[in-house]
């Protein structure tokens, strides 16, 4: 085996993902501690967690940005990304999962699967990321490992298989039986759970563990269908199966996404974290196991298949931008093929711009170490890239490849923002520009009619935190308006326009003539502008100007000035004047033409619909459902467990402002709710008329 193959098989790129407060960051902190990366364990509730390095995170005790770090365990190098669990920061989860090879999903032993766990799980399904699960907080009142496993099967459709059987629960949780080695692991309290001893399985658990182990083996046999020898052993002599054989089949099942093994522990009390580290190495895939990478060759538009090789052509994905007061702009990248050296010149193939790398950094939360090169499988950061943003591909000059992009959701909430003093105007513009580069779900636009600057994001907390960062990092004070719904506009039928822009005011005039056809695009696909000009009726050098004009025209809608989405525009015909035509004339004409076409294409206003989950005592269930119905909500279903009910609904965001407060008074403070963007839908006609009047 060559050095390169050996190295690659020893790398694990993993994410730690979960619902807010399931104990994700604490689990990561313990991993860093045991793998010798930190000498003192950081506690989230003390504001000392290494991975939560932004001041806002330490104050609020939640994780906002995905911090990246590298640790070593059992001769493997593990790159870990700790992702946020709060729904306003889903882009952080989305972009992390896009570059990971495997993930650990952390669940709370009391709550099991919570709404945000479902979102994160769906995102991981989309990118086909293999997962193992860790049921955390086994020492809490009401902890129930097997109920958590069942909720994973029911709510996530996961093939969740217990590999542990807890010994005791709540304050009596002392260890677990490892169903693979058939040993009971007891944590030694005087070592704070850092050490344990192996003993025989307790008498009262022997029968249950034997059943669980047989169920595990049966499941593995069905997952690895082609392995007849394993199947025969399970049927005829399950006790003869070795640990090694089980690990091999388990690894194959996890990598193929057919099985999700579930471990248990309590990270805060240090129980079960080393066992988790062992299986991260044993079961989760290396970059080599994820196999061939698919991209598009820009020269001939054909699909390219790249093997993860050190000496292959360079293909890397920028998945996060960070601004550092000392170093400047830092771009986080994942290398899928080839090697990237410090000082090298590369191509951003998404933007067709040349870039130069001045420094390469290995990150540990916000500490950094300089490196001379990164190679296939590495996750690291580079300094010196000017144009690259989230989702861009970096490659060799002569190998123009574009990798699959990261899906970026549309923002759902708007706020007007202005500097407190005239002197802050420039600083505010710089801050907004830097923050929108870092976070693709944060948009900055200006309202043409009022001249106001509008910031848009994924929720109130999202915009709150960005405002905090402006004050702290950019020293800029700003006034913000009340949160407003971020409406969009779209068209519902085909339309066309023929527009001439002619100006004659002595001397050289202006002339442009553009014909467009527009049609609705698939929901969520965004706007597309294509040129179908043939025979040079509009010269080639003017076509980019027409496209730019069309794109700018789509930024403000024709009903109420909200941006148009999901519109497909084709430039089909036009004409020009030898002397009077210019790029400016064609740009203005493109913008006018698309507006005219949209007016004829039955435009409508869209509003963000939120997926809402309310957990309430059953005696308040009727009130909660009635209230959601009054808010134009559509009830999707409800489920009950232990005198509590969970109601799932889809409700327009415009009806949900201040919902937490009214839910509290409706249920005497006993109900809780979560909310996340689901999709955009057409606004009812009556409400559309009110919005247009405003």
UniProtKB/Swiss-Prot annotation:
Keyword list, A-Z: Cytoplasm, Elongation factor, GTP-binding, Nucleotide-binding, Protein biosynthesis
Domain spans labelled tr-type G: 9-288
InterPro entries for this protein: EFG_II, EFG_III, EFG_III/V, EFG_IV, EFG_V, EFG_V-like, EFTu-like_2, G_TR_CS
Compartment(s) of residence: Cytoplasm
GO molecular function list: GTP binding; GTPase activity; translation elongation factor activity
Residues that coordinate or bind GTP: 18-25, 82-86, 136-139
Domain of life: Bacteria
Pfam families assigned to the protein according to its UniProt record, in alphabetical order: EFG_C (PF00679), EFG_III (PF14492), EFG_IV (PF03764), GTP_EFTU (PF00009), GTP_EFTU_D2 (PF03144)
GO cellular component: cytoplasm
Keyword presence, Protease: no
GO biological process, one term: ribosome disassembly
Role, per record: Catalyzes the GTP-dependent ribosomal translocation step during translation elongation. During this step, the ribosome changes from the pre-translocational (PRE) to the post-translocational (POST) state as the newly formed A-site-bound peptidyl-tRNA and P-site-bound deacylated tRNA move to the P and E sites, respectively. Catalyzes the coordinated movement of the two tRNA molecules, the mRNA and conformational changes in the ribosome.
Family assignment from sequence similarity: Belongs to the TRAFAC class translation factor GTPase superfamily. Classic translation factor GTPase family. EF-G/EF-2 subfamily.
Protein's UniProt name: Elongation factor G
